[in-house]
Amino acid sequence: MLLVVDVGNTQTHFGTVRDPHSPGGGELFERWRFATERVSSADELGAALRNLLALRGLELSEIDSSIVSSTVPELGPEWAEMARRYLGHETVVVGPGIKTGIAIRTDNPREVGADRLVNAVAAFELYRSAAIVVDFGTAITYDVVSDDGEYLGGIISPGMEISLEALWSRAAKLPVVELGEPRALIGKTTIDAIRSGIVYGFAGQVDGIVGRLRAELGSDAPAIATGGLAHHIVPTYTESINVVDELLTLKGLQLVWQRNC
């Protein structure tokens, strides 16, 4: 069984895959999310993994291979060490030198985030055409793949929760507001007005940027939304997103693993 791990700045999303060598990818058997702790040790990660697997009737011994992508530099080595100690193998860590199967057409390929690359791999594998991936996490990233399966680059903007935090931390009279659905476009309270601004503001950003990217590509490329916060605005408040795929990054990790093992 294959363990696929996506370590984000805010959350870590991971799952197990049975029959990972099957063409096009095996079935994702189980998956979990937990808060990313930047000071986690290999032993803490191993204990957490053992406990979560046990809740689903699984054991560490059933995992015979793994792959990790991490946007938190200090946690990649800890996951690799955890795999050595608790799983008994060397994990694949997505980074420079890893075979992705796509050409990276950016000025500095080494600076492209691992999660963004595996999203691009999954998008092209699924659609075999130009594609746009919108990943809603700590930041909102837009990544573009060409008709030839090349990673062309993308766009990074502050995420919804970062924007909320900036409002209440920089504006003295504004309250702390949790991300949530607005009751109406025109807010009747300060909280409603803030939620409306975040949700409709980011929905407008998504539709505007996706439209411009399609014009740049010269095609009606499919737009795929993913990430832990996507459900707050997609598909209810957006018009440009074709598909919501919460598992896109994990699917991409499995594909990259296949190309390296």
Spans of model-derived segments:
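Short glycine-rich, Thr/Ser-proximal phosphate-binding strand/loop in the N-terminal lobe
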Residues: 1-51, 149-175, 180-181
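Short glycine-aspartate micro-motif
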Residues: 2-6, 67, 131-135, 224
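ATP-binding/phosphotransfer module of carbohydrate and carboxylate kinases, centering on a glycine-rich
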Residues: 2-5, 36, 40, 166-261
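Short beta-strand scaffold segments in enzyme catalytic cores
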Residues: 12-17, 133, 140-145
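Short, well-ordered amphipathic alpha-helical segments that serve as non-catalytic structural scaffolds
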Residues: 44-56, 205, 209-210
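Short beta-strand-loop/turn "lid" adjacent to the catalytic site in phosphate-handling enzymes
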Residues: 54-112, 148-154, 159-160, 188-199, ...
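Conserved phosphate-binding catalytic cores of ATP/NTP-utilizing and phosphoryl-transfer enzymes
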Residues: 100-131, 254-261
